[in-house]
């Protein structure tokens, strides 16, 4: 059976379109007493963006810290904070930031209408109730979080997304002006998340004409951005992220993302840089992609951390392997239905020990 997947309902793209946010939200406000919750990356606390957020009356602005990978405990605490502040639910959650902030905003919008801990919903299609209205506004591009049906969280036992049609944003605003000032390394790592999405999707067993069309376009845009120059590179990167996210919506990612989840869960390494660390050792699986990736790192003077796993305690290494192996759809996409015969625990251990 073919997948009938949920897409973002409304999209605005263009330089300066952030200024339309107030008007978009006005149509969603139920009364003068209702409120919106803006969840904004705390790196913007002393920036001009702070003054552009259209906070009204009883609206709440929550500064979200993503120094660490998003955790279920943090999502649960933010959800409780909002519930404690009012007897009514907000009219909407607006996530403004990179992939981690957008994932947190998506998770909170789900947990406001679903009971228990967000850890209970890590997996596929476990969410029972529709989320409240939620909007995504990226200030970094590459993760595809603005269009994905997942919100990736580290829980007590595993790093895994809340994968659900209810997770998908109702509205996104793609304003290239918002990503213009990103630090060089962070921009690169996040952009490579998109590039690696595309390589894994285009080389996967789940590939189809839908995912191929979006994946090839996103891959081409990534090459223009990171192997070329141009005044519209922010626009291209933002659209690459969108198209890359759409590509994996109808296929899957692969080996790099599975191994990166293990690094992130055990060592706390952020997703973008984690993908880059892992991908550099996957030439046997994605030879052309890794060669181009290394060309990009050299061109942008990126120096990846080394020897992260050297000397790590054996129980932590085994936990990395456990976390990676949970992600069965990723392995099947990369290696086929017989992937367990190809990617053994010992093979994964060998790959991690190189990093």
Regions found by a protein language model. Give the residues of each.
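Glycine-rich phosphate/pyrophosphate-binding beta-alpha loops
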Residues: 142, 245-270
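Catalytic phosphate/nucleotide-handling subdomain of diverse soluble enzymes
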Residues: 261-300
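Carboxylate- and glycine-rich phosphate/diphosphate-binding segment that chelates Mg2+/Mn2+
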Residues: 151-250
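C-terminal charged capping/lid subdomain of soluble metabolic enzymes
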Residues: 6, 294-355
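Short glycine/serine/threonine-rich phosphate/pyrophosphate-binding segments
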Residues: 18-22, 45-49, 100-106, 144-147, ...
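Glycine/threonine-rich beta-strand-loop-alpha-helix active-site module
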Residues: 73-81, 87-177
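ATP/NTP phosphate-donor binding region
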Residues: 1-92
């Amino acid at each position: 059976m073919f997948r009938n997947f949920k897409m973002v309902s409304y999209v605005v793209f263009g330089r300066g379109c952030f200024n339309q946010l107030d008007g978009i939200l006005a149509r969603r406000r139920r009364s003068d007493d209702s409120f919106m919750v803006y969840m904004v990356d705390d790196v913007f606390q002393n920036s001009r963006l702070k003054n552009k957020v259209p906070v009204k009356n009883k609206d709440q602005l929550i500064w979200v810290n993503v120094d660490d990978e998003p955790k279920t405990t943090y999502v649960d605490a933010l959800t409780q904070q909002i519930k404690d502040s009012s007897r009514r639910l907000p009219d909407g959650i607006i996530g403004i930031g990179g992939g981690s902030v957008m994932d947190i905003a998506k998770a909170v919008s789900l947990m406001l209408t679903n009971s228990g801990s967000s850890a209970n919903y890590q997996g596929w299609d476990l969410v029972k109730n529709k989320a409240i209205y939620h909007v995504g506004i990226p200030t970094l591009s590459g993760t595809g979080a603005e269009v994905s049906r997942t919100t990736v969280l580290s829980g007590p036992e595993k790093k895994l997304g809340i994968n659900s049609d209810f997770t998908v944003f109702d509205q996104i605003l793609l304003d290239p002006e918002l990503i213009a000032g990103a630090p060089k390394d962070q921009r690169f790592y996040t952009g490579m998340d998109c590039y690696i999405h595309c390589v894994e999707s285009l080389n996967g067993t789940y590939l189809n004409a839908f995912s191929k069309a979006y994946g090839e376009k996103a891959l081409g845009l990534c090459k223009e951005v990171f192997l070329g120059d141009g005044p519209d590179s922010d626009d291209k990167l933002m659209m690459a992220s969108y198209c890359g996210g759409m590509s994996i919506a109808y296929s899957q990612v692969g080996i790099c993302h599975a191994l990166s989840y293990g690094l992130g869960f055990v060592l706390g390494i952020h997703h973008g840089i984690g993908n880059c660390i892992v991908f550099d050792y996957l030439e046997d699986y994605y030879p052309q992609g890794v060669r181009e990736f290394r060309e990009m790192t050299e061109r942008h003077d990126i120096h990846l951390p080394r020897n992260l796993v050297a000397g790590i305690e054996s129980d932590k290494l085994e936990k990395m392997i456990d976390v990676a192996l949970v992600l069965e759809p990723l392995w099947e996409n990369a290696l086929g239905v017989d992937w367990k015969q190809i990617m053994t625990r010992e093979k994964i251990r060998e790959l991690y020990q190189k990093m």
